[in-house]
Amino acid sequence: MAESYLLEKLQSVDQTYQELTHRLADPDIATNPDELQRVARLRSSLEETVLTYDSWKQTQEELIGAKQILKDAGGDPEMREMAALEVEELAEKLEELEKKLKILLLPRDPNDDKNIMLEIRAGTGGDEASIWAGDLVRMYSRYAESQKWTVKLVSESLADMGGFKEAILEIQGDRVYSKLKFEAGVHRVQRVPVTEAGGRVHTSTATVAIMPEVDDVEVQIDAKDIEITTARSGGAGGQNVNKVETAVDLFYKPLGIRIFCTEERSQLQNRERAMQILRAKLYDLKLREQQDAVSSMRKSQVGTGARSEKIRTYNYKDNRVTDHRLGQNFSLAGTLEGDIEEIIQSCISQDQQERLEELAASPETASAIN
């Protein structure tokens, strides 16, 4: 690993890890549970990098030794063959460890561990776009279930012919944002709609937004900026729904954002849910402003989450899904059933590769971007 800045960073991580280990061994830390948890969590986040770095150093020493054996083998063909094979294997192992270390050293997205609000809006295509939005709700629900995440529909605007004009899913689980952030953008479908009598293929779209959940400390909202009205709501609650106004219509005046919540059983719960969605939307806007500010520094982008970015086309006639960022095709049937892990992992890998290239080209620029 010739890059001196990477070695310096690894040495710094190793030193920090050792200091945290000593800190955890101090009996005094047990008297402060919050500090104990913070230090333990930080140490755990560095552990894989440190262990990989240790393995890299050991492999490097073994490679030096194997090269010396090969050099000293002289005219012994059997010894030379064995030593040459070991040199080759160790060199390959060292290269793989270097790749892993570079990825581990990439700055982590601070939102990666967060739960999300996933918003799907019908785009161009009329009734067919709403039906398509409903198909995407099902696809993401299936994927979330396969990941052992929990999914809840927290806001919806139903369309007359089926599907949704707009739907918001709350998805909770392990590192939800780290995977689904690559799904933000425009999803285009090409198929013959059920409402089409002539059998012609139509093109419709739906827009997906991925919003990390935030609390009221991260996003503060002035009470005078919101206007809340209530209405009677259908759904859970039995006869109560006909007597009590449980639905909440929240309007955020500065940006004209309207949120309608009916899914909870009480007005208070729907009000809290509407505020939760509003905070996520405002935080998402702030994130996108930050991304726009640095996007000119990036030579290329994968899954930046731009609302206008057409990321994928679902072609029913050819039973094919094309991800335009990857330039790859996938099975339509499997994708619609929520089998999108391969697509997501490919996006993660490509994003890591681009960031590594930026890091190699200019460590200072890469640091600024992240």
From Swiss-Prot:
Belongs to the prokaryotic/mitochondrial release factor family. The keyword Cytoplasm applies. Its main location: cytoplasm. The gene is prfA. Peptide chain release factor 1 directs the termination of translation in response to the peptide chain termination codons UAG and UAA. It comes from Rippkaea orientalis (strain PCC 8801 / RF-1). NCBIfam families: prfA (TIGR00019), PRK00591.1 (NF001859). This is Peptide chain release factor 1. PANTHER family: LD18447P, PEPTIDE CHAIN RELEASE FACTOR APG3, CHLOROPLASTIC.
